[in-house]
């Protein structure tokens, strides 16, 4: 098995390369907050020497409640993304939910994300593939790790091989997610880069009746475990005031803790990737 390398400008995304941080905020709440969070991430990652991609959503189309905040929408969201890219010289990742969004989004962002709940929607997969953009596939909570090969095949047959696989937890009974560490290793056997969404893996879906709950206090433990696998990247959302965030605050890392948090993750990644592989199958 060879590790596929995805090139994003000067950034190399691969399971055997230094990890890439995919981070930012869950949903665009305002232009000013997005700029502030992007600036913090940019400064911290530059200081620590961590390759970085800014993440935010312009529309959270799968909220638990019809009354929940969804975001500014595509048109306004893309304007904010353009300003962030220009101001901080950052690559961008965001998610799409409809086929018509793919082409205009791909003109602005570098990586398009396929949401976990939509990962089997063939029309959306094909539309995303045809943009030629790098694709981040969130593993659905209801699929086994080995079933990701079917989604990979759809993208390949639609002409796109620039694929990242993202673990974000699996359903474990009602209102709970667990992370299968061996499942992430199984996805790595595909050769495609695997990243770990340690933020959303902390969710308790529907845990607050009309919104998702979370276990923010365990954000460090879960991410440390994932980084010990030797992954291509880590996906982390942060917020300056998680308790008042408009989406997934219970899972968000407090922004002021970002630097110390990433220092630990980088130390683990550096250590694990300094080891020679051991083939215990023989």
From Swiss-Prot:
Predominantly, its location class is: cytoplasm
The terms under GO molecular function for this entry are:
3-deoxy-8-phosphooctulonate synthase activity
Under Enzyme Commission nomenclature, its number is 2.5.1.55
* Key words, A-Z: Cytoplasm, Lipopolysaccharide biosynthesis, Transferase
Catalysed reaction(s)?
D-arabinose 5-phosphate + phosphoenolpyruvate + H2O = 3-deoxy-alpha-D-manno-2-octulosonate-8-phosphate + phosphate
* Annotated coiled-coil segments of the chain: none
Subcellular localization(s) per the UniProt record? Cytoplasm
Single GO biological process annotation from the record: keto-3-deoxy-D-manno-octulosonic acid biosynthetic process
UniProt xrefs under InterPro entries: Aldolase_TIM, DAHP1/KDSA, KDO8P_synthase
EC main group: transferase
| Annotated Gene Ontology cellular component terms | cytoplasm
What pathway does the annotation place this protein in?
A: Carbohydrate biosynthesis; 3-deoxy-D-manno-octulosonate biosynthesis; 3-deoxy-D-manno-octulosonate from D-ribulose 5-phosphate: step 2/3; Bacterial outer membrane biogenesis; lipopolysaccharide biosynthesis
Family to which this protein belongs = Belongs to the KdsA family.
Which HAMAP family does this UniProt record tie to the protein? KDO8P_synth
- The protein depicted here goes by the name 2-dehydro-3-deoxyphosphooctonate aldolase
Q: Organism classification, top ranks? A: Bacteria, Pseudomonadati, Pseudomonadota, Gammaproteobacteria, Alteromonadales
């Amino acid at each position: 098995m060879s590790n596929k390398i995805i090139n994003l400008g000067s950034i190399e995304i691969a399971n055997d390369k230094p990890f890439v941080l995919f981070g930012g905020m869950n949903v665009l709440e305002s232009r000013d907050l997005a700029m502030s969070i992007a600036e913090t991430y940019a400064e911290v990652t530059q200081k620590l020497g961590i390759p970085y991609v800014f993440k935010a959503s312009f529309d959270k189309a799968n909220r638990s409640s019809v009354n929940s905040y969804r975001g500014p929408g595509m048109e306004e969201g893309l304007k904010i993304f353009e300003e962030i890219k220009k101001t901080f010289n950052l690559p961008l990742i965001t998610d799409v939910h409809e086929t018509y969004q793919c082409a205009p989004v791909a003109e602005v962002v570098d990586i398009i994300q396929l949401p976990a709940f939509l990962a089997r929607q063939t029309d959306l997969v094909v539309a995303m593939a045809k943009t030629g953009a790098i694709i981040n596939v969130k593993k659905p909570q209801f699929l086994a790790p080995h079933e990701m090969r079917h989604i990979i095949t759809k993208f390949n047959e639609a002409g796109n091989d620039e694929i990242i696989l993202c673990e974000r937890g699996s359903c474990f009974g009602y209102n709970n997610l667990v992370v299968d560490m061996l499942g992430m290793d199984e996805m790595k056997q595909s050769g495609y880069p695997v990243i770990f969404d340690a933020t959303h893996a902390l969710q308790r879906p529907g845990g607050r009746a009309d919104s998702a709950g979370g276990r923010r206090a365990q954000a460090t433990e879960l991410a440390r475990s994932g980084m010990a696998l030797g992954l291509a990247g880590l996906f982390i959302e942060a917020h300056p005031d998680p308790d008042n965030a408009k989406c997934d605050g219970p899972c968000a890392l407090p922004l002021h803790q970002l630097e110390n948090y990433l220092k630990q993750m980088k130390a683990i990644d550096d250590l694990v990737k300094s080891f020679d592989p051991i083939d215990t199958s023989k």
